[in-house]
Curated annotation (Swiss-Prot):
Protein name per UniProt: UDP-N-acetylmuramate--L-alanine ligase
HAMAP family registered for this protein in UniProt: MurC
Protein source organism: Desulfatibacillum aliphaticivorans
Pathway assigned in UniProt: Cell wall biogenesis; peptidoglycan biosynthesis
Catalysed transformations (reactions): UDP-N-acetyl-alpha-D-muramate + L-alanine + ATP = UDP-N-acetyl-alpha-D-muramoyl-L-alanine + ADP + phosphate + H(+)
Binding site residues for ATP: 112-118
Amino acid sequence: MYRKKYSIHFVGIGGIGMSGIAELLLNLGYQVSGSDIKESDITQRLAKLGGTIYRGHRAENVKGCDVVVVSSAIRQENPETASAREQGIPVIPRAEMLAELMRLKYSVAIAGAHGKTTTTSIVADVLAAGGLDPTVVIGGKLLSIGSNAKLGHGEFIVAEADESDGSFLKMSPSIAVVTNIDREHMDHYKDMDEIKDAFAQFVDKIPFYGLSVLCLDSEPVQDLIPFINKRYVTYGLTTQADLQAGDVTTEGLTSRFTVRHNKKRLGRITLNLPGLHNVYNSLASIAVGLELNVPFENIKAALESLSGVHRRLETKGKVGGIVVMDDYGHHPTEIRTTLQAVNDSYPERRVGVIFQPHRYSRTQSLFEDFARSFYQADYLVVLPIYPAGEKPIPGVDSVSLCKALKAYGHKHVIHAPSKESALQELDKTVREGDVLITLGAGDVYRVGESFLASRS
């Protein structure tokens, strides 16, 4: 296939979503450059792969490139995008570049408010177990390969579809997975109906020979079904699901469940990932594998050897009888799900949480939901809001959130104005046998790492 080797520049190349696409393009032989405000493990990796990395955003960084790729976090007034437009260089969203990559192969896109990253990683492992060697682009680092992207030699590509700004509608996947729909990204969507409409458009973009894979246990996903006029399959715990998990049990960090397809028993899975949410993620992956003719024995083997995803209920270490975990969860639903999984895994231990709210807009739109999301934590330390490029909103801060948490009945809430003060509070609060988990999409994981280092 003819493919001109364009020069492609990424603004914010160190982001987890941008870097995966950049890595794939480098491996395909394209000339890739990018800028970010700080150096990181990600930018260092891309530089070693041959990328040209600039620290800071400057107009001259885009000189000579053919296209500029931006994420939704990049502001309109960014000097690089402004310079590109002045020069007539196309400026496109990340999702459009990903959609172009997906056009080259048989594509599987995983969308949903929660569980996208883990489900994408499991689908990739399932297809690999079937000998399909897929290309993978994911919003988190796969522990098995140490990266968020992999160039496969097979005819399939598996990618995470980000609904946050509606740009996932640029994709036209052959298989579209919807894990769930929730009230999220309200800075972009005006209400829940608009969110559901976006997902309805997403599943409608599959070709006539394609397939939608839908979680029947998510009520907003159920609302899509009457409007779908192409082939679809459902999964869940309910008996109405085409692919059903039954007899679910948990023991420590392990889950077990029986898989039935159209009422026929396929087998029992032992999953080395905790939580009911990972049972759902696995069901979606099984559905994709079966559609692509991966034998169930291969699917089972893949699921039972999963190594997980960085920052998804990841055990960071143990010290002095204390287990330290980390999770990316930053939405009330994710927080409740994660804490349920931790309590199921460690039913006789105290659970302590260090939470860093992510974005002022999210904290504002889901404020009361956040205030009622931590009942399964024995104690809670709340850090200042991680802005993620947003400007502060008056009255929206972690002090107000702590007051609301206490007002809703949480007995042990501590406000920590810095990571250093959070560590000081933990020294006074944590005791042997506790499970300590850092929660949030920012850099809260550093508190857990510092805690482990201070006690080693």
